[in-house]
Regions:
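Extended ligand-binding regions for polar small-molecule ligands
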Residues: 24-29, 62-74, 133, 139, ...
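Short helix-initiation/N-cap motifs at beta->coil->alpha
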Residues: 81-92, 135-136, 170-181, 217
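A ligand-binding cleft/hinge motif common to bilobed small-molecule-binding domains
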Residues: 88, 105-113, 159-162, 183-184, ...
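Periplasmic-binding protein-like
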Residues: 47, 122-129, 194, 198-239, ...
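Alpha-to-beta junction loops
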Residues: 41-42, 76-78, 95-104, 145-147, ...
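Flexible hinge/capping segments at coil-to-helix
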Residues: 120, 129-147
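Extracytoplasmic small-molecule ligand-binding "clamshell" domains
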Residues: 23-105, 110, 244, 253
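Short loop->beta-strand "edge-of-pocket" segments that line small-molecule binding or catalytic clefts
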Residues: 40-47, 61, 139-154, 168-169
Length: 266
């Protein structure tokens, strides 16, 4: 079965709240049917992105968790959070009907099965290399014989798969395993979210993160394709959360104030 503790989830959090304790929903019935067809809003949380999700002994926190809970409050439904350790696993899980909403970067491959809102946060994808590496710029990396560690199915994996002309990608199950593989397998570079790479490099003075970026990763909310009423509601919800300062305040609480809030969708 695809959904296993070891291969798919870091953990599963059930944050189910009695419906009677929820405020009355102002959402139309067709929206609730799309976003909570079981009566519970099932939210997929990608713990592979440290900008959006932070973990501690009490569970998961961060802007995606805050947005999921706020959406459930708007809908007047209970909520169940399922935590995955990589974005690629969230995308795979939609095929099994495991979630109703997710927080993923907008990518063409994902858009074949997921309807996306406009982004709420924009983060950078870049490279980490050895401190003494001859690779100095983003352009230097795309050369014959260069091997790059990536988390399988991540936004940067999908982007680099489309755009690289010469370098080869070496895929690992999750971002942490990708960085471990980069070191253990003596690869030339590791791709990832800048904040995650910076945190890793701080513990490894023999590593450095490139100041340039190869990708602006547009983080958005999504729902399985075909839930049109639900998607339109999500689009409005995301714009409201950006305009009200909800997203900015959530990121600040999470220690991610340097993340860039996406502009309003025109």
């Amino acid at each position: 079965m695809y959904k296993t503790f070891a291969a798919v989830m870091i953990s599963t959090l059930m944050a189910t709240i009695a419906a009677a304790a929820q405020p009355a929903s102002t959402a139309p019935p067709e929206v609730i049917k799309d976003l909570a067809p079981t009566g519970t809003l099932r939210a997929a949380i990608n713990a592979g992105n440290v900008v959006l999700v932070q973990k501690d002994a009490s569970g998961v926190h961060g802007v995606t968790v805050d947005l999921a809970n706020e959406l459930a409050r708007h809908l007047g439904t209970p909520i169940a959070l399922t935590v995955y350790d990589a974005a690629g696993k969230v995308t795979e899980a939609v095929k099994n009907g495991e979630w109703d909403i997710a927080f993923l970067a907008i990518e063409p491959v994902r858009a074949a099965v997921i309807g996306f809102t406009a982004p709420y946060v924009i983060i950078e994808g870049t490279y980490m290399v050895a401190a003494d590496s001859p690779l100095k710029t983003i352009a230097d990396v795309d050369r014959d014989g260069i091997r790059i560690a990536v988390a399988k199915g991540s936004a940067y994996d999908l982007y680099l798969t489309r755009t690289l002309q010469h370098a080869a990608l070496v895929r690992y199950p999750s971002p942490p395993l990708g960085f471990e593989g980069f070191v253990a397998d003596k690869l030339d570079a590791a791709a990832g979210v800048r904040q995650f790479l910076n945190a890793f490099a701080k513990t490894r003075p023999d590593m450095r993160v490139m100041p340039e970026h190869f990708q602006e990763i547009r983080e958005a909310m999504g729902t399985p394709l075909g839930r049109d009423a639900g998607l339109q509601y999500l689009k409005t919800f995301v714009e409201e959360m950006k305009a009200s300062g909800f997203v900015a305040k959530s990121l600040q609480r999470a220690g991610q104030a340097d993340a860039v809030i996406a502009p309003a969708e025109k």
